[in-house]
């Protein structure tokens, strides 16, 4: 995918409360079958700790091919490990270009960037965030996994701290994916922490948001 052929994406925004320049950039990547309007709903809650942050939740660039509505970062047809890593690799230029453009738009450096993703969006947050030449401040993955963990050692460029949360009743991405992802991250030298949420399915609950807010507060520079 050449630079000129990379699809341009955008989505809903939540601007800094004070109306001035953003002090941080928090990018929210939605899951399969949703769009940016889904995760931008997290912005008002996270903005309590980051009133001067700019939030943006871009719409993925592909129509979902396994549901009648919504979007996808890549096709999940086949649901194999190979499908996931190839899909993440193909979508990475779209996400990386967007992150670069948003940092430039806000006049911010990478250490003021956090990438937060749910499910397939979390896969993209991890895949891209660990391969960026300029490391983001941190990454958050809700109900997700790391595509192609066996490729990480050879391709990793950044080691930002990572938070993972996962419901133990998740029927979409099994809960055992989280400790596997955490182990792969730590083996590559990435600081990672996690919490399993009892009774939670494939989703984000209030505790997940509390954990994310605390994690971002510790790692995202003001």
What are these regions (language model features)?
Residues 117-121, 125:
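Gly/Ala-rich beta-loop-alpha elbow adjacent to hydrolase catalytic centers
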Residues 115-117, 142:
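Short beta-strand immediately N-terminal to the catalytic nucleophile in serine-hydrolase-like folds
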Residues 124-128, 150:
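Hydrolases whose catalytic domains are alpha/beta-hydrolase-1, hotdog thioesterase
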């Amino acid at each position: 995918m050449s630079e000129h052929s990379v699809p341009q994406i955008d989505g809903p925004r939540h601007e800094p409360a004070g109306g001035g320049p953003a002090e941080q950039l928090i990018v929210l990547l939605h899951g399969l079958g949703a769009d940016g309007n889904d995760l931008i709903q997290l912005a008002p809650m996270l903005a309590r700790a980051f009133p001067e942050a700019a939030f943006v939740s871009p719409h993925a660039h592909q129509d979902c091919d396994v549901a009648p509505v919504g979007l996808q970062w890549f096709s999940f047809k086949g649901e194999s490990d190979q499908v996931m890593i190839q899909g993440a690799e193909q979508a990475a230029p779209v996400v990386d270009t967007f992150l670069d453009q948003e940092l430039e738009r806000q006049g911010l450096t990478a250490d003021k960037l956090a990438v937060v993703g749910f499910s397939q969006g979390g896969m993209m947050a991890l895949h891209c965030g660990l391969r960026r030449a300029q490391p983001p401040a941190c990454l958050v993955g809700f109900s997700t996994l790391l595509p192609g963990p066996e490729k990480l050692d050879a391709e990793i460029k950044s080691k930002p701290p990572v938070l993972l949360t996962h419901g133990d009743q998740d029927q979409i991405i099994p809960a055992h994916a989280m400790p596997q992802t955490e182990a792969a991250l730590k083996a590559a030298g990435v600081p990672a922490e996690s919490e399993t949420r009892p009774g939670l399915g494939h989703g984000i609950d209030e505790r997940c948001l509390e954990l994310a807010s605390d994690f971002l507060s510790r790692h995202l520079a003001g």
